[in-house]
Structures are given as C-alpha cells and as structure tokens.
Amino acid sequence: MTAPTGTSATTTRPWTPRIATQLSVLACAAFIYVTAEILPVGALSAIARNLRVSVVLVGTLLSWYALVAAVTTVPLVRWTAHWPRRRALVVSLVCLTVSQLVSALAPNFAVLAAGRVLCAVTHGLLWAVIAPIATRLVPPSHAGRATTSIYIGTSLALVVGSPLTAAMSLMWGWRLAAVCVTGAAAAVALAARLALPEMVLRADQLEHVGRRARHHRNPRLVKVSVLTMIAVTGHFVSYTYIVVIIRDVVGVRGPNLAWLLAAYGVAGLVSVPLVARPLDRWPKGAVIVGMTGLTAAFTLLTALAFGERHTAATALLGTGAIVLWGALATAVSPMLQSAAMRSGGDDPDGASGLYVTAFQIGIMAGALLGGLLYERSLAMMLTASAGLMGVALFGMTVSQHLFENPTLSPGDG
C-alpha cells in the first residue's frame, strides 16, 4: 500500500539491523501508549487523595478512555488516511506526550480527564497504523512476525510499565510517574520520526482509503471484527476481577497472589514471540489452537468456582489456568489483527481501525457485564467468559477461511 524509501532490501533480508531497529521503535511506541493508558490502575488511591475525589470516580477514567477511543477511531483513521503513515504515528505520539503533560500538571479532576481524552482520541489512530507500518517494513511472508514484535511492547507494558508507574506513584507521587511517561513518549516520538520511512501513499492507493473505503460493507472484515468483539468481551468480563479470581477461586493469597499475577504477565510476554512463526505459516491453526486454549482455561476456572473447597490440587489446576489465560490472551491479539488487516485488502489501516473499534467495544462491554455478574457470583462471571469464548471459538472454527493467509501456498496454511 505504501512505497517507503530504502526498503527494497527487505525482500531478501527482512531482518536487517535497520529493520530490527524500526520494529523496536514501534514496539516502544506500543509499550509507552499502553503504559500511559493503564497508569491510573496503579495510581487510583494516589490520584484520588491528591485531587480529593473518590477512587470510583478515578476508576471511570478507564471506561471513558475506552468509550472515546471506540467512538473516534474510525472517523480519525478516515480523516488521516491520506497522510504518510509515519506522520499519523508521530502525531499520535505527540498527542500522547501532550496529554501526559496535561495530566501531570492537572490542578483538578476535570483537567486530568481532559488530558486523558486527548490520549484516547489518538489511541485508535496509533493502533490502526502501527501494525500495518510494521508489516510494510518486511515481506508479506514475515507479516505475522512483524505484527507480533509490536505486541512484545504491549506485554512489557503490563509486566514492567504498569508495575513501575504504580511503584513510582506510591513512592514519589503519581505526577512524577506521569512526567516520566511524558518524557518517554517524547523520546519515542522523536525516534519514530528519525528511524521510520515516511511511507507516502501512491496515487492509485489513494483510491481505496479514506471516504472511498467501504470496510463496513466488507463481510469478511465485519465477521473478523464481530468475532474479535465477542472474544474480547469474554476476556474482560473476568479480567477486571482477576485478583479476586486468583484469591477466591484459585485459592492463592498473600505474596503468592502477586507472583501469580506476575506469571500471568510473563506468560503473555513469552507467548508472543513463540506464535510469530506459526502465525505466518499456519494462521488458521494458530488462532483455533489459541482460542481453544482460552476456552479451556475459562472452563476450568468456572469448574473451580463452582467447587466448595480449596486444595493443593485445585490451586495447582487454577494456577495453570491463569498462566494459560495470560499466555493465550496476549498471543491471540496479533492473530486477530493480522486477519483484519488481510481482510482490508488495499487499505489495511482502515481495516485495522475497524478492528480497534471492535476491540474497544469489547473492553467496555466486558467490563460492564463483568461488573453486573460480579455482584451475583464469581461462578456466573466465569461462566459468561467461558461461554463467550466458546461462541467465538465456534465462529472461528466454522469460518476458518477468514484467517487464511493469501501469500501462502495451500500446503502452507
């Protein structure tokens, strides 16, 4: 779709030091954006005390963030469709930088919320362009590996970024944590401007983007997006209350609870590079295996939730289910986004934008449904997650053609 200068060598040497550096910059962009997005999670109490508001009110920052991102993604992606891809990415990172600076200096909750809105507006734009940029840096046969390299940054944000900002908020205050994120975002924006090719669209490519795009009429893309929304909803129904699940369902408490949470994140970090090659060579099989594992993990946790006693065996089984959940929830995301981009044809950015919107709707729906079911019982909440994952798995199984890679020969997929 684009013609970046100086990338012709990638057809023969896809993993040159230059390409590795460019992909690393993209991973850093994903890392800093996700770290900024979830910064309030580890600083809820600190923000509430400092701004003299309730913890519940601070918690709504995450819900409003997802809502703004869901509403603005598709219009913003269409409006910027004619921009060079590097410009769209850098503008997103600059907006992130400004939003974090506004947050750090916010005198009250309203200003803090306004800063978060600015960050949320360009959230969808960044996630719509970052994976397509990565795939354009390498040959089509390496697109899956390029996409998963970005998700390493996402996993690191959960394993390193969020705990680090939480610790900084506790020790030195949440404003300093926001200042550090501001500086890191500015550095990544500069690195992206210097390291990435401009990626200007050709005249013939402009015919398929922006207002001319008809992704909502693309049945293949719509199906991928709907299945994504169902799966993400199933995940977030329970993920919001994962600490409670570990404590009351698995039966792990105290310091071991923190270690199991860390294992959840590390499992996701490890799984991403492991699925990179299968995603390129066997995309259909990879996504089915991933969704089967997620469904099994939630089914096992549901069975444990209906049990009445905690034993060493149930703790061991529950621990395995939590780790499997962490590994596959992270691994499946690049699989689904890759399928969405392939479905978009000549406009992978626009297709990715629709995918991001579906993802954000899934986050909101999952959090809302999870809150309603949590008030009734953990068992019902986990049953809903298992059921939604099962529905998504069934849909993906009967529609495996959605995940085919057209660059592969029939024997490869």
From Swiss-Prot:
This is Chloramphenicol efflux pump Rv0191. It holds the Pfam family MFS_1. It comes from Mycobacterium tuberculosis (strain ATCC 25618 / H37Rv). It is found in: Cell membrane. Keywords: Antibiotic resistance, Cell membrane, Membrane, Transmembrane, Transmembrane helix, Transport. Its main location: membrane. Induction: Expression is negatively regulated by the transcriptional repressor Rv1353c. It is a multi-pass membrane protein. Belongs to the major facilitator superfamily. Inhibited by the drug efflux pump inhibitors verapamil, resperine, piperine, chlorpromazine and carbonyl cyanide m-chlorophenylhydrazone (CCCP).
